[in-house]
Amino acid sequence: MVVSVAILGGSGYTGGELLRLLLSHPEVEVKQVTSRSRAGKFVHTVHPNLRKRTALKFVPPEALEPVDLLFACLPHGETAPIVDRLLELAPIVIDLSADFRLRDPAAYEQWYHWTHPRPDLLAQAVYGLPELHREEIRNARYIACPGCNSTTVILGLAPLFRAGLIDLDLPVTVECKVGSSGAGGEAGPASHHPERSGVIRPFKPGGHRHTAEVLQELTVCGRTPSLGLSVTSVEAVRGILATAHLFPKQPLTDRDLWQVYRAAYGQEPFIRLVKEASGIHRYPEPKILAGSNYCDIGWELDELPGGRQRLVVMSAIDNLMKGAAGQAVQAMNIRLGFPETLGLEFPGLHPL
């Protein structure tokens, strides 16, 4: 039986990417897509790549009707106040906002400067990162999709922390280089072409909100790493490259790292280990992931003076796919018992 779905907040880049995927999904029928500002307009007037793919028009949020599964793509702070209404509309909700990603309401105060209106529901929401929470997703009623930067960082580092290889007495430093689509579809001074073109601009050198998710997921045996996350805007539309600098407890070899990552991700359909001896694609590169749901992970060991060893881990995704819409569809497939890769097989383009 075909599953009926709707998208709440479908006029942004994430909503458009989600609609693109769902329109080609063989087990899904998209019933409605909402937009308050564009109600009554054909969706292809906002998402021109979908011309002749659908005759759907945007409807106002108040016009939403019950469906089997609801995707919520609202800005931060707009989902939590209406969560009861969403759960009335659908027995399964997949939320792409940040409103239910964190389990601790105090973390919202610290990182978002926001008092969560429904702290009673935080423990019920499942963090929708399949590689870490697949079994929880299978039975979840409310799935909170991770942020794009946090997805990239967590997938790159989780196997190392879970294996106990990292010295938690030393700081972990991560920088994410991000494309412009991560800022959303609304124009502003920073996205004006003369200001954005050719840029390498520090966006959030410290205090990025996605740090909270990374700390939550990398806390092992009650111990939270001393991790700092910096985000830099670069000349690209799609993609994130996270580069993490860590210090192992004991010296590691490439073979050790291959074993750890293969044990964690060897059966994962959307994780690829990229560590080549030669060629221009020796390490993860976001450009070749555009439009795909893959996360590519690689590393390099750096022998420092004095006998200390530094581990550099690189992970890359398409922020609109594995960092948002693709991951949401992957979670939907798991939750509904479909093959996990259904509708997500596109490998990306090369060259691009």
Curated annotation (Swiss-Prot):
Q: Which GO terms describe its cellular component?
A: cytoplasm
EC number(s): the record gives 1.2.1.103
Checking Gene3D superfamilies in the record gives: Dihydrodipicolinate Reductase, domain 2, NAD(P)-binding Rossmann-like Domain
Instruction: Describe which pathway this protein belongs to, using the record's wording.
Output: Amino-acid biosynthesis; L-lysine biosynthesis via AAA pathway; L-lysine from L-alpha-aminoadipate (Thermus route): step 3/5
Q: Which domain of life is it from?
A: Bacteria
Please list the residues that make up the active site: C148
Mostly located where?
cytoplasm
Q: Which family does it belong to?
A: Belongs to the NAGSA dehydrogenase family. Type 1 subfamily. LysY sub-subfamily.
**PANTHER family referenced in this protein's UniProt entry, alphabetically:** [LYSW]-L-2-AMINOADIPATE_[LYSW]-L-GLUTAMATE PHOSPHATE REDUCTASE-RELATED, N-ACETYL-GAMMA-GLUTAMYL-PHOSPHATE REDUCTASE, CHLOROPLASTIC-RELATED-RELATED
The name this protein carries in UniProt is: Putative [LysW]-L-2-aminoadipate 6-phosphate reductase
User: Can you name the source organism?
Assistant: Thermomicrobium roseum (strain ATCC 27502 / DSM 5159 / P-2)
Question: What is the primary gene name for this protein?
Answer: lysY
